């Protein structure tokens, strides 16, 4: 749910458990694999783009390890997952995607990855970065894929201190990528979420985005029910009215 002011001086807001929240002008979403953003934040992304925010995606890997079917080779699967993520992004109003090409299943918090992420941050110049939590959740191990943890940690390090420090990766300055300070990071799947975004009105588009990942979701006849269940729990935890759906984040001030 978004409210867009019609009078001069009014600003677009997101509906959250903390009340209306001003919509950031630019948002960057960084995830380890294609489909991660759609499971974690596609409803929020749709609400943001509806309200006028410019949202960009950065996928650390191409998802080439994301299939148990060995009849498709890694390069073919990577190309397919690029297509699926591009189609999914369009469902929620995103057309700017960057695929970094780091190895699926072997993402590490390296200086090379931090440099790549710093370059994307400086190019897109977001107010808010949405990424995966770097904290392992031992009672929900599926939420703690090693690639997710590494992507989240590398993103936090790229946000602070790398992206704002002109002495970090001086070659980026030579490419015209000036330092940039991100205002906030929103962490998905964090055990201590403190912001829930009401995505009731964008739920159908979230599902459409997830359905675009046919290689990952075609077998899930219960996808709608499963996702609705997760989002209902988020909304109830935040005290939102019965029937509302929410995506949850941990907000980290970084300015």
Residue ranges and their predicted role:
Residues 1-127, 250:
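Active-site rim/loop-helix segments in enzyme catalytic domains that contact anionic ligands
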Residues 2-28, 108-255:
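Metal-dependent de-N-acetylase/amidase catalytic core
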